[in-house]
Amino acid sequence: MSLRRIMVTAVRNLHPVTLLPSPRINILYGANGSGKTSVLEAVHLLGLARSFRSTRLNPVIQYEQAACTVFGEVQLTEGGTSNLGVSRERQGEFTIRIDGQNARQAQLAELLPLQLINPDSFRLLEGAPKIRRQFLDWGVFHVEPRFLPAWQRLQKALRQRNSWLRHGTLDPASQAAWDRELCLRSAEIDEYRRNYIKALKPVFERTLSELVELDGLTLSYYRGWDKDRELQEVLASSLLRDQQMGHTQAGPQRADLRLRLAGNNAADILSRGQQKLVGMRIIAQGHLVSQARRGHCIYLVDDLPSELDDQHRRALCRLLEELRCQVFITCVDHELLREGWQTETPVALFHVEQGRITQTHDHRE
């Protein structure tokens, strides 16, 4: 799976452009502030209908423009193509289209799986549990088709219970029914996550060993409540506290991934450079998605040279190359990446200057 064509209109400072990227390696280079990251942001918008730089989409829309639009032609793994389009108006209207039909965000994400590697990747270690849950659930979503409907039912049950905790609006029978639904969906989500982590751990360890030597680094999964107790029991025993807090404290919404080194929190021991390398391990998820979907992720790698020394930069390039996936990489000096690829790997170069994009090397040549 890869993007054959990308059309970008009114995204930040970018001039309207049509890109014909390589199915493998694409390097966007230029001075800081030229618009390189905005290209990655446009691809991210196309695949996830949201920006990785801002929780609000209005700043993404170019100044004095009414809307921004990104269109993509996707080469499907099984053959054929699919056309995707995402448009956001300044007044708030959001349109997602797949092959001419209105679509939902989840359909978009399923069709175009993206992985982002940027200077914030190390936040997987030192950031809040929510960041690690999002990382975990991205992978589960792409390998387990039953996950999304189960997660949606869980969220509905959780909203009902939290509303009752705050306002006491449910009768005892309704409260018991929603608690049962919450427990059933929690067990289902927990099973999908555990199965995924079981498959991820050996891939994670192998991938990490190719980037950095960290003997004894372990990855474990906390499901969000005591592993030796049923959730129903935990909910009953914590009911008074939940009512005082106004929300449910135990359950899958409190799950976390834990990285430990020599029995300690890895974020407390590892240097910032080591944390960045461990953060790069998200490549491991691409292996699992490729196996489950018989297709490939698309990787967005922002400012790679500044984050790694030459040795680890080459190691990361080698891992990305071995995945045989499509990659978009930004950098200031493309010469730092010129020697990172095999001669048979098709590499396209794009120079970005003040929002204008010029292809300086065509992968087809």
From Swiss-Prot:
NCBIfam families recorded: recf (TIGR00611)
Q: Which gene encodes it?
A: recF
Q: Where is the signal peptide?
A: none
The record's keywords, sorted A to Z, are: ATP-binding, Cytoplasm, DNA damage, DNA repair, DNA replication, DNA-binding, Nucleotide-binding, SOS response
Q: What is its main location?
A: cytoplasm
One GO term of the biological process aspect = DNA replication
Q: Which PANTHER family match?
A: DNA REPLICATION AND REPAIR PROTEIN RECF
InterPro entries given in the database record? DNA-binding_RecF, DNA-binding_RecF_CS, P-loop_NTPase, RecF/RecN/SMC_N, RecF_2
- The protein in question is named DNA replication and repair protein RecF
